[in-house]
C-alpha cells in the first residue's frame, strides 16, 4: 500500500504543479476579458448607431483611401460579437461546473475536519 500511496501523491503533486500556473494565467485572461467588456460596449454602440452611415460613406468613396477600415466590413463586428458571446457562454458553462466542484470540495472539507 505504501508504494501505491507514494505514486498517488507523486501523481497529485504533478497535477498541482501543472494546474497552478494555468490558474494564474486564467486569472490574468479573465481580468483582460473584464476590461474588454467596456470596449465591446463601445463597439456595440457604434454598430447600432453610426456604423451603417460610415459603411455607406465608404461605399460612396467619401472616406480617404488610406484610412484603415476593417471595422466597416459587413461581418467584422458581428463575428467579433459572436466570438465574445461564445466565450461568455463557455465561461458560464465552466462556472457552473466549478460551482459543482466547489460544493463537493466543501463537503469533503467538512468531513475531513471531523476526523
Please provide the spans of the model-predicted regions.
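Long, low-complexity or tandemly repetitive, helically biased scaffold regions used
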Residues: 2, 11, 17-115
